[in-house]
Regions:
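Divalent-metal-activated hydrolytic enzyme cores
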Residues: 13-16
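Short, Lys/Arg-rich, polar N-terminal cytosolic tail immediately upstream
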Residues: 1-11
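Non-cytosolic membrane-interface motifs at loop->transmembrane helix junctions
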Residues: 43-48, 105-116, 174-186
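Membrane-interfacial segments
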Residues: 70, 132-140
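Hydrophobic alpha-helical transmembrane segments of multi-pass membrane proteins
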Residues: 19-36, 47-71, 75-104, 113-130, ...
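Interfacial loop-to-transmembrane-helix boundary motif in multi-pass membrane proteins
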Residues: 138-154
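Alpha-helical transmembrane segments and their cytosolic membrane-interface
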Residues: 153-189
Length: 190
């Protein structure tokens, strides 16, 4: 199934906007590094941030490859491109969390980035399920039931992540901007 000719302009515009978004995220990672002082990061943290930025670049490269598809985009390609955008967002939030770690004045922002990072993991898992289901053309009764379960469980999982903004269920960031797991961390990852 390809995008109809009348929809081609919207497809191209949306896809190009996504590529621009990926470029902005890579630039924002670099700007954040300069702003908060990436030189203060321990070497292992700096390596992690660098890997995140390279990961965003790889997402952009793969996204561009999908954009160059000459025959339009079928459902699996569109879902794959959505996963690339979600992964790039997750990588950006991870890089931001590492760069904000240990800055007391930004502990609230660090908490928000961690919460959004956890939410992005859940959303990425859901998008992966949708991609696999479309790729394998799983339309039988069992797949539909699994899809229903995934959709029903998505809201409570996101709610538990968002609850970390107010109650330290899985983690907390102290006043010094340092991240800590709570006893409920493993449970919050399920």
């Amino acid at each position: 199934m390809t995008v109809a000719d009348g929809e081609r302009w919207n497809w191209e515009w949306n896809a190009k906007a996504g590529l621009l978004f990926l470029g902005v995220m890579a630039a924002a990672s670099a700007i954040l590094g300069v702003t908060v002082g990436a030189e203060r990061l321990p070497p292992a943290w700096a390596l992690n941030v660098g890997e995140d930025v390279v990961g965003i670049a790889v997402c952009a490269l793969l996204y561009y490859g999908c954009l160059c598809e000459k025959q339009g985009a079928d459902e699996t390609t569109r879902l794959f491109m959505a996963m690339l955008l979600a992964e790039a967002i997750k990588l950006f939030l991870d890089a931001a969390s590492w760069m904000l770690e240990g800055i007391p004045a930004l502990h609230g922002l660090n908490t928000v980035t961690y919460v959004l990072f956890l939410c992005s993991i859940i959303l990425l898992g859901y998008q992966f399920w949708r991609y696999i289901r479309a790729y394998l053309a799983m339309n039988d009764a069992f797949a539909r039931r699994c899809d229903r379960v995934m959709r029903v469980m998505l809201a409570p999982a996101l709610a538990l992540c968002l609850a970390n903004l107010f109650v330290p269920l899985g983690f907390y960031v102290d006043e010094q901007g340092v991240y800590y797991n709570t006893d409920g961390y493993l449970l919050s990852m399920i």
